[in-house]
Amino acid sequence: MSIIGSFPPGGPRVEVQETRVQTDRVLTIPNILSMARLAGVPLFLWLILRPEFGGPQSDGWALLVLALSGVSDYLDGKLARRWNQISSLGRLLDPAADRLYILSTLVGLTWREILPLWLTLVLLAREAMLLVMVGILRRHGYPPPQVNFLGKAATFNLMYAFPLLLLSDGSGWIASLAAVFGWAFAGWGTTLYWWAGVLYVVQVRRLVRADVAAD
C-alpha cells in the first residue's frame, strides 16, 4: 500500500511505497517461488552463454527459463497478497531476483553483442546510483526503499525486451519483428528505470534533509 510520511511543519512530504509484513514464516509458497526464480539465474546465464564457449545453441531453453521467471514473479506477489503471506524474506527475495535476472541478461546479451555496451553501462549506472542511495538511507536509520509501481513497470518492460532481443538474434521475419518490439520495450524500460531511480534520489534527499532539520 502507499502511505505518506508527514514531517514537521514546513518539512517535506515524501511518498513511501510500503508493503506491510504479514508473516514471519520462511517456507511459504510465494517465498519458494522466489527461491526457485533465484535458482534459475545461473541456469539462464549458462544457457545464454553456451554458444560463446563452443556449446550448442540453447536460446530456446534460455527463453523458457526467462518466461518461467516472469510467471513466478507475477505469482509470488499475487499469492503473497491473496494468502496474507507477505514476509520480510519475500520483500528481499523479489527485488533481488529481479535485479539478478536483469544483470545476468545484460551480461549474456552484451557478451554475445546483441546489446550495445553503452546501454548496459546506462542500466548498471542506475543500479550503482541506487546502491549509493541505500547506503545513505542505512546511515540515517532508514530501510532500503521498497519497489514502487514505476520501478516494477520498468522491470517488466526490460524483462519483455530481453527475450525479444535474444529472439532477434536470428534471421527471418520473426527475428525482425522481435527486434522492433524488443527495442521498443528496451527504450521504455530504460527510461522508466532511470525515472524510478531519480525519484528514489529525490525521496532520499528529502528524508535526509528532514533528518538534519529535526536535529
From Swiss-Prot:
Catalyzed reactions per annotation: a CDP-1,2-diacyl-sn-glycerol + a 1,2-diacyl-sn-glycero-3-phospho-(1'-sn-glycerol) = a cardiolipin + CMP + H(+)
Topology term for the membrane: Multi-pass membrane protein
Q: Where are the transmembrane segments?
A: 29-49, 60-80, 117-137, 158-178, 179-199
Any single Gene Ontology cellular-component annotation? plasma membrane
Q: What keywords tag this UniProt record? A: Cell membrane, Lipid biosynthesis, Lipid metabolism, Membrane, Phospholipid biosynthesis, Phospholipid metabolism, Transferase, Transmembrane, Transmembrane helix
Q: Which cofactor does it need?
A: a divalent metal cation
Q: Does the keyword Phosphoprotein apply?
A: no
Q: Which stretches are annotated as coiled coil?
A: none
Task: Kindly list the biological process annotations in GO that this record carries.
Answer: cardiolipin biosynthetic process; glycerophospholipid biosynthetic process; plasma membrane organization
Top-level taxon of origin? Bacteria
Any single Pfam family the record assigns to this protein? CDP-OH_P_transf
What changes when the gene is disrupted?
A: Inviable. Knockdown of the enzyme leads to lower cellular cardiolipin levels, higher phosphatidylglycerol levels, and increases the distance that hypha grow before changing direction and branch.
Which EC numbers does the record give?
2.7.8.41
Q: Cofactor binding mode, per the note?
A: Highest activity found with Co(2+) whereas Mn(2+) supports a lower activity; no activity detected with Ni(2+), Ca(2+) or Mg(2+).
Give a short account of what the protein does: Catalyzes the synthesis of cardiolipin (CL) (diphosphatidylglycerol) by specifically transferring a phosphatidyl group from CDP-diacylglycerol to phosphatidylglycerol (PG).
What is this protein's name?
Answer: Cardiolipin synthase (CMP-forming)
Q: Mind listing the GO molecular function terms for this protein?
A: cardiolipin synthase (CMP-forming); CDP-diacylglycerol-glycerol-3-phosphate 3-phosphatidyltransferase activity
